[in-house]
Amino acid sequence: MENLTENQATNNNSPFRIKSSLAQMLKGGVIMDVVTPEQARIAEEAGACAVMALEKIPADIRHFGGVARMSDPGMIKEIMNAVTIPVMAKVRIGHFVEAQILQEIGVDYIDESEVLTIADNENHIDKSEFKVPFVCGCRNLGEALRRISEGAAMIRTKGEAGTGDVVEAVRHARAVNKEIKKIQNMDPHELYTYAKEIQAPLELVKEVKRLGRLPVVNFAAGGVATPADAAMMMQLGMDGVFVGSGIFKSGDPAKRAKAIVQAVTHFNNPQIVAKVSENLGEAMVGINVDTLKDKENQNWSTKEK
């Protein structure tokens, strides 16, 4: 696997920079999980910047268990035909053939996702070989930079998708922010040692120090269920928000979807966030993350190599 070089990361005409520029277009937006063309249209009308096409939302994947794979390409194409906004779809970690299929049918972004069953316990997909931008999850700076070195054009927190509990997304966002702040005052020798410590390419660690942030967009994901959740993640420095089960497992999906979009747009205005939070109907019941058991393979946020 050819890792991302410093030249690729900074050259505006490199394939990586072109793909990361496409992801930049989603900045400040909300990406919503959908399972039908009708849901996709609801998301688009609510102001979503993109949709994630799935056969089952994460809450149902948790509930029914079994092996979770890439969604049916025919179903994904139906959603692509139903909306004008970008369409994403998930593949299993390491399953490069699923990614080849999604690229072939024309999805706009591919999410190499821990929500699905892992296909390769040793390797992630070499994302630099694809024309389509990839999204990957992270829990800390090391994971984020390893995924970027493989070609990921967009990063998201892992959180705990399908729970409606935002605690892990908050933990992961704060962890990345803390580590970025930590390296700001490091000299070159310390940077070299720290890059080895977090198992990340030195060139990318230097780039993070220079920028004071990740070199790609960084979205919140996993457990975001309310306008307040979304606004909090934005105030923590996220570039946008993924919302899955929190919308279509709620009492009034269309109204909640619009409210979350407004909360992300006006995240620093408590008056607007308070207003859009009124009368949304029942939120998804959710699962307290503390009740999840690793032995049942339900703690998706722990999946990483």
From Swiss-Prot:
Organism (species): Dictyostelium discoideum
One GO term describing the cellular component: phagocytic vesicle
Active site residues per record: K90 (schiff-base intermediate with d-ribose 5-phosphate)
CDD domains noted in UniProt: pdxS
Catalytic activity: aldehydo-D-ribose 5-phosphate + D-glyceraldehyde 3-phosphate + L-glutamine = pyridoxal 5'-phosphate + L-glutamate + phosphate + 3 H2O + H(+)
KW Lyase (keyword) present: yes
E.C. code: 4.3.3.6
Assembly information from the UniProt record: Homohexamer.
Name the UniProt record assigns to this protein: Probable pyridoxal 5'-phosphate synthase subunit pdx1
GO biological process, one term: pyridoxal phosphate biosynthetic process
